[in-house]
Amino acid sequence: MKYFIIRSLINKSKNFYNTIIKYNKTKLFALELSIISPQEIQNSAEYKREDGSIVGKVEDSTFYDLEKVNNKNLFSQQIFGPLIDFTCACGKKLNRKNKEINVCTKCGIEFLPSSIRSKRKGYIKLNYAMLHPFYIDYCEKLLMKSKKSLHLLLNMDSFFYFPSYKNWVNFLSEKNHIYLFLLKKILIYNRYSYIYKYSTFFKNRSKFPNNKKMNKLFFYNALGFYGLNSRKTWTVLDFIKGYNFFLGNFSKYYKKLSWYAYQQKISLNKYKSNNISINNFIDNTFNFYKNEVNSLCFKVGGDGIEMFFLQDMAVYSIINKFLKLRVLKLNNLINVNNKYYGKINTIIQNSKNYQYYFKHFYLKKIAPVWMTLRRIPVLPPNLRPILDLSGKNYQKTASSGTLLFMRDIMHEGNLFISDINTFYREIIIHNKKAFNFFSSLPTLYYLNELNIEYVNSKLWLLKYYLMPIQKSITSLFDKNPETINNFSNKKFTDLILDNVKPTSILDSLKGKYGKIRFNLLGKRVDYSGRSVIISAPHLKIYECGIPYEMALTLYYPFLSEYFYKKNNNILKKNYNKSELVLYSKSLIFTKSLQSILLSHPIIINRAPTLHRLGIQSFLPKLTHSKAIELHPLVCPAFNADFDGDQMAIHVPITEIAKLEAIQLMASSLFVYAPASGLPLLIPTQDIILGFNFYTNDLLLKTSREDKSIKQAMNQGFINECHIPYWIKINTKDIFFKFLAYPLRNYIIPIELQLNIKGFSKIIRLNTFKVTNLVFDSLDLLIKKNYISNWLILNNTKFKYLLISFLQNKNLLTNKQVYLRTTLGNIYFNKYLNL
């Protein structure tokens, strides 16, 4: 039958095989995840409508009054689309005659289907940069700051500071990132000839020349930071004074001059050839600072990290420092004491990790500044819904003339609002508050000798206005308690209801019930079912038992076509599926299903599908159980057993799919594993145990009472093979045979029960040892260990001694001796004639 079915399908579909080959040769494109720039976030969320207006920016934090004109809130119909198909907030519908008018002139809503609200996104523009919580660990590497220092910075307890130039834009316009690849040629142009002579990396200034200016210059130049000195807190702002300020920041400008000279292939030796001393060079540079530098610009939180990354040379200064040390070590130009040699080796070894990050940033053309957020994408409204539990319409929760905020609505207990909406609202509110406050203080971020006291009096406001934005962004993307607690010890009492942690975007994606696994990877498809598997050894290897009710549901379209071709009125084209159950017990359905299943293979899959053997095809057989029946030999390929495992059934629809299922995926084809070549269709576990259990010789061939047991079994009075039964046995034959042939493949009976002089005596036996003998006359033999092990029965003297003892007690002919065994043991020994 199987051969006939395969040949008939192949003959009907001769040209399908070529189609399969062409399909397998199609190219597959990979999915790459990368950091997106703020401008790309804005471009993907903005939409240009037919009237020329651009929408997408969310500015209002309210959830109500969706019919308001020019509304830009989180559920705006102008941004995300109408609530009702092709209907605006005014109640107007799309004019089929005049299709050129697609936007309502009154409320500004496009005439689109409501499903667009599941696709359109928006964005929130932040006035101040914030660090993305996913990239905190990466920023530690790029900034060479400890985790504690970085969290102090994000918690607004420390800050960055930068020299503020009058011509700041022109000063930072050089393309300094090319120096990363030219640094290997540094010795050719003799670039750092005045700096490499000394140990400029350590704080021990005794090794430097006596010139104090040169000592400070080399020390600050060796810090490796451009525009950043770590751990500067609010209490040390008074250090900004005249010449000391210049010495503290000159090294950073000196690097700029050095890199610029290197790009132009100019050596610093030109100053020596022109009789210009290094001291005069420093004084001239200080005059430049005095004229060009007007104040110190400091930044906190994400603004400071953004400004650090925005500088051209800042991103590569750290790796340049490591490359410089490696070049010096290779050329034996570092003359330091032994106590510093190990430290330099450690730093050079760790530099490989930093180069790894910089390499990927450069190759993927990703700017490190994108790790800070300037635009926040807003999900489509249907993915973050508001559910009305009272049955009212949430669009009209605002009464006449009054505006209800989200907190007031939530206290009513009528609405269920997604936590993501709460975080969006908090971000918009605090972003507006911070912008309105700091716009009135334009000089707050610039320090000089005149406004230090003024800035000190306003610094606490930075933390008050900017910290809530960072907390809300962290909670929006990731609710990890460690990440949240690092920013502030204050709990989210205003965001957490009933002590339940809010759900972030990451939480909605990950896990078993996340968007990816629940809606994409584990998506239910049509013509599929799922049930528990049970063992069915009576089936063929290529057969599978499918429940009758499941087959009626899966093959309903094929049944409809089958009866339609035969002009049968039982099923019509638009027949209701629920009425099919009424006819499910009819014989005509059973015969029709059986004829359909002959030419329709099914595909069975067991999750997780780790290799191609996890999905195979079978020929279905109807069963009246509610479980899928499988042959035990095919389970090793699926890595399945019968302890509650479930499998899914898929019905191939097209002829190509049927042909592929039979030719490429049939279970009878997977006799050997494709990876190792080892056999797959082998008996394992319960099959081997069953063979061993049912094929042991129980010495019941001489029993006179086994005929009645077999007769009762054949007549149906006994049908349980594993329930213990007590049967009478011929003790003389059994004991004699057992004692005569102790080393054969016999097993000792489970239990022997004898009735001697009205007292019940029990002998419990094991395969190797006598565990308990209650014959008083044999105590002496037990103490002498004559019968502790059955191998001792090879001693003929002991065998005759035991037999003579039993004969004297008339036990070998006693009919009141019973054997405790099972029906399966009796039947299989008789059936196999062992």
Swiss-Prot record:
Q: Does the keyword Repeat apply?
A: no
Where Zn(2+) is bound, by residue? C88, C90, C104, C107
Q: Which domain of life is it from?
A: Eukaryota
Question: Is Zinc there in the keyword field?
Answer: yes
Pfam family name, one: RNA_pol_Rpb1_1
Q: Which GO terms describe its molecular function?
A: DNA binding; DNA-directed RNA polymerase activity; metal ion binding
Q: How is the cofactor bound?
A: Binds 1 Mg(2+) ion per subunit. Binds 1 Zn(2+) ion per subunit.
The main place the protein resides is: plastid
A single GO CC term for this protein reads: DNA-directed RNA polymerase complex
Role, per record: DNA-dependent RNA polymerase catalyzes the transcription of DNA into RNA using the four ribonucleoside triphosphates as substrates.
Q: What is this protein called?
A: DNA-directed RNA polymerase subunit beta'
